[in-house]
């Protein structure tokens, strides 16, 4: 599974992407984030307020209950605003 980080999320995570192999109990976006936040304090801080983060799986916007599987590409980025 490939994770992509953009904008301030990339800065906080210290990388633009990483490949991970979460346990089989990780079945949707929310359980992936829960697993990620238990890995280290950086992830825990970065994903502490999910209202400031949008998520896409395989380049489609999704909700937290969206199912995921090995081989998926999951992107995390701030909401885009215009003006």
What are these regions (language model features)?
Residues 1-82:
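Ubiquitin-like/PB1-type beta-grasp interaction modules and other compact soluble beta-rich domains
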């Amino acid at each position: 599974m490939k994770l992509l980080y953009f904008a301030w999320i990339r800065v906080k995570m210290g990388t633009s992407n990483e490949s991970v192999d979460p346990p089989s109990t990780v079945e949707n976006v929310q359980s992936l984030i829960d697993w990620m936040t238990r890995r280290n304090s950086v992830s825990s801080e970065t994903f502490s307020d999910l209202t400031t983060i949008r998520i896409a799986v395989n380049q489609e916007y999704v909700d937290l209950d969206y199912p995921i599987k090995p081989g998926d590409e999951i992107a995390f980025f701030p909401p885009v605003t215009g003006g």
